[in-house]
Amino acid sequence: MADLSAQDKLKQICDALREETLKPAEEEAGSIVHNAREQAKRIVEEAKEEAQRIIRSAEETADQTLKKGEAALVQAGKRSLENLKQAVETKIFRESLGEWLDHVATDPEVSAKLVQALVQAVDAQGISGNLSAYIGKHVSARAVNEALGKEITSKLKEKGVSVGNFSGGAQLKVEERNWVLDMSSEVLLDLLTRFLQKDFREMIFQSC
């Protein structure tokens, strides 16, 4: 019994030592594990949030890049369309108008009407002086004078028209005032282009 009592005491002592040393260590280990789990949980949550932030940022960057690319394409398309319109205007409108004017403005009857209109405009303003009329270099002065008649040619310094250095149309010079009233084909082309260009664009490009 004495031996058992000694064993019991030894057991009690071991249990007491275990209780005093292991239990606090177990509690400390449990606390460490709990803290580690909480910290790991926070790290995982923060990692998820950071990953989502990176994804959102990448999506926004990609979206902005796409929008910039789309805007650049739209702008390039607008520039190409405008260049095409200008090319069409130059080729179809201005060149065709120029060809038509070259034909019309070299007609003696048309040249005579232009000279007559210029002389009458000067008379209507009460302007007097030596008047010199010029017609296009490809127009017959004789044919124009015949079409004008003496009523108009008598008002001209040379009693008739002279040939100028322009293609077609007419010019009237008021010498005392150093005025030149210009209705040459070149000036008429610019005038008609300005007046008709808007209508031409609307007619041709209304669906663009």
Swiss-Prot record:
Task: Give a Gene Ontology cellular component term annotated to this protein.
Answer: proton-transporting two-sector ATPase complex, catalytic domain
From the UniProt record, give one GO term of the biological process aspect: proton motive force-driven plasma membrane ATP synthesis
Highest taxon above the source species = Bacteria
- Keywords from the UniProt entry: ATP synthesis, Hydrogen ion transport, Ion transport, Transport
Q: Name one GO molecular function term.
A: proton-transporting ATPase activity, rotational mechanism
**Entries under NCBIfam families matching the protein:** PRK01005.1
Q: What's this protein's function? A: Produces ATP from ADP in the presence of a proton gradient across the membrane.
**Family the UniProt entry places it in:** Belongs to the V-ATPase E subunit family.
Q: By what name is this protein known? A: V-type ATP synthase subunit E
The scientific name of the source species is Chlamydia trachomatis serovar D (strain ATCC VR-885 / DSM 19411 / UW-3/Cx)
Gene that specifies this protein: atpE
